[in-house]
Regions:
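Acidic/His- and Gly-rich active-site-bordering loop/insert found
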Residues: 2-120
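Residue-level signal for well-ordered alpha-helical scaffold segments within enzymatic catalytic domains
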Residues: 26, 132-136
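Active-site alpha-helical elements of protease catalytic centers
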Residues: 120-133
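Conserved small/polar residues in nucleotide/adenosyl-binding loops
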Residues: 137-142
Length: 142
């Protein structure tokens, strides 16, 4: 990869690190374990809230978003060829909390340089990082 591009990406990450962490924390705070299906929330209230928050974050970054009947959603950035897509598939639901947590699993924290909380690595954190990567592309490419 171009060294100049690496430096630009590093600068973008440094400039946006605190907001990125806040966005991950906001998603982690949503208990998105599958719940009882109800009108407008086929997987329960928690997964619906996480979907809504994710689409809100994407829209705030200037991406076009679509909620597909509350089952899933997506954000997109128009490209030169509308027939071609690059997709990053993530999810924002989590499995039930198991034993061994020594702190609230829905309150993200940083410990010894690690992010801890339900979904930080599977898959809420990667979802937010993906949105920031697309946002960087949107802001920097012609």
């Amino acid at each position: 990869m171009d060294q100049g591009l690496n430096q630009k990406i590093d600068a973008y990450i440094a400039e946006n690190k605190e907001q990125l962490l806040q966005d991950i924390a906001a998603l982690v705070a949503i208990d998105s374990v599958e719940g009882t299906p109800e009108e407008g929330a086929p997987f329960g209230k928690g997964p619906r809230a996480a979907l809504d928050k994710t689409l809100e974050l994407a829209a705030g970054m200037g991406l076009a978003t679509r909620n597909c009947e509350n089952y899933m959603g997506y954000a997109e950035l128009a490209g030169a060829d509308p027939e071609k897509y690059l997709a990053a598939i993530c999810h924002v639901d989590v499995v039930p909390v198991g034993n061994g947590w020594t702190a609230d699993p829905f309150k993200m924290r940083i410990q010894d340089g690690w992010l801890l909380g339900r979904g930080v690595s599977d898959d809420k954190g990667p979802m937010v990082v993906t949105l920031y990567a697309v946002s960087y592309t949107h802001l920097t490419l012609p």
